[in-house]
Structure formats: structure tokens, C-alpha cells
């Protein structure tokens, strides 16, 4: 059965095209700096928002029109697989991602849940044999079911800890079987509402124990994918332990886990933490911890995770600027952890949304590449910090200066003169590059 019968393979038609079902900027085979766009961007479709999301919110029931929703139970799960690979093929995306409960319904017992998962994984495995689309990452949902009300690895109930471990064990086995590039840990319930009833030390210790067990089991079964932590400060939990990259990095270092993990950074989670997307990418990058990206955007006027498709070209450009300086994402990718708006309820809206996101990151890639090629910001930064390449600044950097020497130097100083940060000039340059690249004539790559 065709679930999108009126939509064919999405072509690249260039920036002058007015076809809503065509890419204007994303040309998978176009080379940018020696690699194709497809190799740079490594796009991925999120199974949960795209195939299980129904548009419901706290004020209204689901309203999405989805042809596969005429089914229920395991028949619905199978229909979603069919619809998924049809969409993957028509968008020509190289990757997808899922939580365990996205692909198969939970049973009355853990054994029944395993049975359901095995049946759907069999089906996915068959589709993957003839599809270019591979598994970027999978994960276990450890936050939706009432059993996880107090957390999973940080639950006050050891039975819940054990159940969560069983789900992750199964998830790692699925990851190995389907050839996942990564495995993600997102602690939506790993945190607390109040310290009045919380043993924070025990919870953090247990979270570390849980992650060490996961590392050990991955080695035991021969799964060599990259482990990823996805930081988020809040929602659904008031205070989550993986608040942001800096917080999660400190946790990994404290518990001897840093060498086993990198970060999966989501734009909207950065917004909730009070950071820009590029800030979180930069912190991860300079510590060698940038692993993958959940590509979306938030609404700064709203205080929750809106998971909008990314269309802000400043953000996609500055994100790709960090990713290119990182040497790419390695085994990671750009996963669209994004959902169409409640008012965009027709099946074709799924295509319009992904086209918008893919085009936006294609522009960001080309602008970032040209900025780096022309060393626009690098030249300015080098000049700004020039005082640390000579004289007393060089001694500071090389570790040969101490407080006594610095005091002696400072006592001899006259007036200290600073130079302008030129922020407005730099923003003008960024605008100029964006306009040049996004215009039809801006095709240099």
C-alpha cells in the first residue's frame, strides 16, 4: 500500500524553483569543500514525531490525518514501518532514529514487549536490506510509562532501575542487529522535583552505575556504536541532571565515563537551558565531545520544548560553522527531532517540513563553508587575541609567568587601551555571506 500516493521522489530543482515538493538548496550530490552535501549533513528522520505523533496537546486530542492510523496494535506498527520507508525513499534520506516504543507497542509483560519488538525489528531489517536508509541511533523510552514516574536509572525504586536496565539491554541488542551508528541516552525523568525527598548523591551514583553497565554490555555483545548523552535542563522533570553540555560533561568526568560518551545536542534544549544552539555545540566541540545533533528550533517566546522544524538561517549557519570546525559529525548526523505544527495536519505537510529543514541546513552548510574558507571570523579573532602571542601574553600562555611577575609588569603599565569588539561589523558580514549564498548567483562552493 502507498501511504503518500500523490508524492513522488523529491527532486533538487534549484533556488529559482517554485515547486513546493522540490529542494531549492539541498542537492545531495553537490560537493562543498571536497565532500557531498549528503556526506556533510547526514540527515535523519525522527520516527516518533513523524509516524507516531498525532498532534495532541494538553488542550486538545490528536488531529493528524495519517493513512496508517486506520490500523491498531501490531498492524499499526507494521503499517508505520511501510509508511516510514516510503517517506525515507521519497526524501532520499540516509538515516532514521527511533525509541523502542515508537516502533512496537508495549505488551502486558516485558517478555511480550520483547516479542513485539522482535517482530517489528525483523520487518525493519528486511526493509533495510533494499533501502539506502540506515539507523543513525535508537534508544529506550524510559520516561512515558507510569513506572518511570520517579525516574529510571535515578528512581528511588530498585525494581524500576532493573526494568530500565532490561529495556536498554534489549535496545543495545537491537542497535547491534540493525547496525546503528550510535545509541542515545536521554534522561527525561532523571532528575528531581524537590530536594526535600531526594537523595541526590545516591541518584547520581546510580545513574553512573547504570551507564557503566551499558558500556560493559555493549562491549560484551560487540556493539561498537558511539554512546551519546542528550542534555536537557527541564521538561518533563523540573530539574534534570543532564542540564546542559557543561553539567553533563562534569558528570561524565566525575564518574570516569568521558571516554565512552559524546553528546547529542538539540537546539531547542539549548534554548531551554538559556543558551544558544551554537554555544552548546562550541562547548562540546572544544572538549572533543560533539557527537550528533537533534536539528530543530524552539520559540524563545514560549517556555517549553516546541520542537519546530529548523528554518532560521542564522542558526543553521552558525551550527554548521561549529560542525565543520569539528571536522564533521563522524558517526553522528542531523536528526530532525521536529514535528509539524498542530495546524499542519495533512500527510504532505510532513514533506514540506522536511524539505524546509533540509534546505535550511544546506544553506547553512554553504555559508559556513565560505566563511571558514575566507577566514572571516578567524582573522578577526586572531587579531583580537594577538596580545597572547607575544610579550607578557605569551608568557601567560606558556606558563612561565606567575603573580609576582605579572604584578611587576602591571606596576610599569600606563593607561591600558582596549580595541573594539566590532560586533555590528561582524553581523553585517554574516548577513552579506548569507545573502550571497542564498541568492541564485551565490553558487560558489
From Swiss-Prot:
One of the GO BP terms on file: D-xylose metabolic process
Cofactor note: Binds 2 magnesium ions per subunit.
Gene3D superfamilies per record: Divalent-metal-dependent TIM barrel enzymes
Cofactor(s) listed: Mg(2+)
Subcellular localization, as worded in the UniProt entry: Cytoplasm
Residues that, per the record, bind Mg(2+) 2: 266, 269, 305, 307
Keyword NAD set for record: no
UniProt subunit comment: Homotetramer.
NCBIfam families in UniProt: PRK05474.1 (NF003998), xylose_isom_A (TIGR02630)
UniProt record similarity statement: Belongs to the xylose isomerase family.
Name of the protein this chain belongs to: Xylose isomerase
Native source organism of the sequence: Geobacillus kaustophilus (strain HTA426)
The organism's taxonomic lineage, starting at the top: Bacteria, Bacillati, Bacillota, Bacilli, Bacillales
Amino acid at each position: 500500500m502507498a501511504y503518500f500516493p500523490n508524492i513522488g521522489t523529491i527532486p533538487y530543482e534549484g533556488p529559482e524553483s517554485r515547486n513546493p515538493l522540490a529542494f531549492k538548496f539541498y542537492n545531495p550530490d553537490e560537493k562543498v569543500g571536497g565532500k557531498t552535501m549528503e556526506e556533510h549533513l547526514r540527515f535523519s528522520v525522527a520516527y516518533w514525531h513523524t509516524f507516531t505523533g498525532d498532534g495532541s496537546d494538553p488542550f486538545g486530542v490528536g488531529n493528524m490525518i495519517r493513512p496508517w492510523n486506520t490500523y491498531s496494535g501490531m498492524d499499526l506498527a507494521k503499517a508505520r514501518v511501510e509508511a516510514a520507508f516510503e517517506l525515507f525513499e521519497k526524501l532520499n534520506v540516509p538515516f532514521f532514529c527511533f525509541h523502542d516504543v515508537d516502533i512496537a507497542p508495549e505488551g502486558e509483560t516485558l517478555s511480550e514487549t520483547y516479542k513485539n519488538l522482535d517482530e517489528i525489528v525483523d520487518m525493519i531489517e528486511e526493509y533495510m536490506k533494499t533501502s539506502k536508509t540506515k539507523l543513525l541511533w535508537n534508544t529506550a523510552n524510559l520516561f512515558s510509562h507510569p513506572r518511570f514516574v520517579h525516574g529510571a536509572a535515578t528512581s528511588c525504586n530498585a525494581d524500576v532501575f532493573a526494568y530500565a536496565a532490561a529495556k536498554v539491554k534489549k535496545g543495545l541488542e537491537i542497535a547491534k542487529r540493525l547496525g546503528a551508528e550510535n545509541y542515545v541516552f536521554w534522561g527525561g525523568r532523571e532528575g528531581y522535583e524537590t530536594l526535600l525527598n531526594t537523595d541526590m548523591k545516591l541518584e547520581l551514583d546510580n545513574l553512573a552505575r547504570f551507564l557503566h553497565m551499558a558500556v560493559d554490555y555493549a562491549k560484551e555483545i560487540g556493539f561498537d556504536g558511539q554512546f551519546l548523552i542528550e542534555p536537557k535542563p527541564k521538561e518533563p522533570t523540573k530539574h534534570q541532571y543532564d542540564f546542559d553540555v557543561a553539567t553533563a560533561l562534569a558528570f561524565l568526568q566525575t564518574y570516569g565515563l568521558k571516554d565512552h560518551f559524546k553528546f547529542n545536542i538539540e537546539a531547542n534544549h539549548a534554548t531551554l537551558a538559556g543558551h544558544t544552539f551554537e554555544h552548546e555545540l562550541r562547548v562540546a566541540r572544544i572538549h572533543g565531545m560533539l557527537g550528533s545533533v537533534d536539528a530543530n528550533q524552539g520559540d524563545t517566546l514560549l517556555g517549553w520544548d516546541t520542537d519546530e522544524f529548523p528554518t532560521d538561517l542564522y542558526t543553521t549557519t552558525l551550527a554548521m560553522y561549529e560542525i565543520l570546525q569539528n571536522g564533521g559529525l563522524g558517526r553522528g548526523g542531523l536528526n530532525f527531532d521536529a514535528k509539524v505544527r498542530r495546524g499542519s495536519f495533512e500527510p504532505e505537510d510532513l514533506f514540506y517540513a522536511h524539505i524546509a529543514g533540509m534546505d535550511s541546513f544546506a544553506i547553512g552548510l554553504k555559508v559556513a563553508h565560505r566563511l571558514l574558507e575566507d577566514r572571516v571570523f578567524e582573522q578577526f579573532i586572531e587579531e583580537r587575541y594577538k596580545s597572547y602571542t607575544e610579550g607578557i601574553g605569551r608568557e601567560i600562555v606558556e606558563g612561565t609567568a606567575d603573580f609576582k611577575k605579572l604584578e611587576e609588569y602591571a606596576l610599569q603599565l600606563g593607561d591600558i587601551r582596549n580595541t573594539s569588539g566590532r560586533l555590528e561589523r561582524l553581523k553585517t558580514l554574516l548577513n552579506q555571506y548569507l545573502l550571497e549564498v542564498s541568492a541564485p548567483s551565490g553558487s560558489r562552493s
